[in-house]
Amino acid sequence: MRNFDANGPFRTALPKVAVDYFRVPGIDPAVTIHLRHKRLAGDLPRGEHPVVIFVHGATYPGTVVFDHAMFGGGSWLDYMAVHGFDAYSFDVRGYGLSSRPAEFGEGSRRGLPYARTPDAIADLKAVVDFVRARTPRSKVNLVGWSWGTAIAGGFASKYGELVRHIVMVSPLWIIRNSPVSAMSRWMTSAVPTLLQSGDLLGAYRSISKSEARRRWVRGLEPDVAEQLMPRAEFDGWWRALANVQGNDDESSESVEAPNGVMADLVDVWSAGQATYTPESISSPTLLLVGEWDVDTPAYMAQEIFSRLKGASYKRLEVLARGTHSMALEVNRVDLYRRTREFLQTRFI
């Protein structure tokens, strides 16, 4: 049995994991999507593994959320590959290594908010079509994190025949406060005092390293914060992020992220609406949230759970000692394991 150590490398030698990189044409001809694929090398012919596709959140791309090795161990993609999955992660348009519009790097306030939720769902559809063309499997598993749960949920509610299981980590749902306070929670740049429309936000926003760290561990005692995400681990992760989404290079003290999701937070989520209907999801669904998540608190997962009336099976779990970003923290392997076991289960 292959064992994965939360705080270090594999207890036994890491099996060789093959990695592939693809540039997937988007449904929008101006968009090209970066897709990463990991699997056990030489284990089974292509297409024999179960398929899982990871969908990232509002600020950080899949490249560094799902495939950055932490604490001397492997990444989430590595973990899934070692356990027999064809594991994929992609960057939504404007994020990471996917194509960016001209507004990127030319001033964050230029243009309309880029990469709104319907755009991200279109990117996921292009990825699913590409992956299904490479495998005989008719259905894929989806794992979404944060905003990625709205993307994956929106896809599953529209294309349920293509989805086997879906896992929602730190799921986003309708916000129980005003647009300004919602933006204060989510945005890491200056918040306008009055927001009548998300279109006022501009195409991109900047996020500083110091603000990203503060938001990650806010509400935690300093010693607990250092245990969950040691400063040295955060610094290494930030360098990887800045290398693909920074204003300059890996030494950059700030990164840029599209504002489409922020516009949706103002126009939709904080206005008492949602971008998808959980009632339309038919696949078995697992919701996972950390007990210290202040970005998407447990009430959001509870409300989604109550609306999953069409799901053939549903489960909600609160994981101890985890924040909104528990996928990158010291206890992350508990999250990995629960996700894997759910995806490997056949529900009747």
Regions found by a protein language model. Give the residues of each.
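Conserved acidic catalytic loop of the alpha/beta-hydrolase fold
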Residues: 118-139
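Alpha/beta-hydrolase
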Residues: 177, 181-286
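Conserved alpha/beta-hydrolase "acid-adjacent" motif
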Residues: 294-300
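Conserved hydrolase catalytic core segment
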Residues: 137-143, 147-178
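Catalytic histidine neighborhood in serine/cysteine hydrolases
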Residues: 309-325
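Short, surface-exposed "cap/lid" segments of acyl-processing enzymes
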Residues: 42-89
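N-terminal cap/lid segment of alpha/beta-hydrolase-fold proteins
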Residues: 3-47
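Catalytic histidine-centered segment of alpha/beta-hydrolase-like enzymes
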Residues: 322-334
